[in-house]
């Protein structure tokens, strides 16, 4: 059996915990050292990892971490009953709402956390 976990780099561990617990309903599982916290949503763990801006995520590349809005081909989708309620909490806790769509299939909101990481809130 394989279990999925997700790692998210952040510049402020306490702020990230507050955001993911308060806005998205994640549960705190434990601290893992001084620079990592483990959260849980349903059966998936989210590892929040404090990484300083400007540090290198890869030894083989000149890319440096920054926490401005950035795009990645992989993102998280959080499924919920009430998209508008979750978006309001995201905004209150420092995240952003970048638009969305609505149709017969449901509703989606495009959002970011305070560290530039994009994700979607979906009601199907």
Protein language model regions, located:
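Short hydrophobic beta-strand segments that form the core of ligand-binding sensory/regulatory domains
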Residues: 120
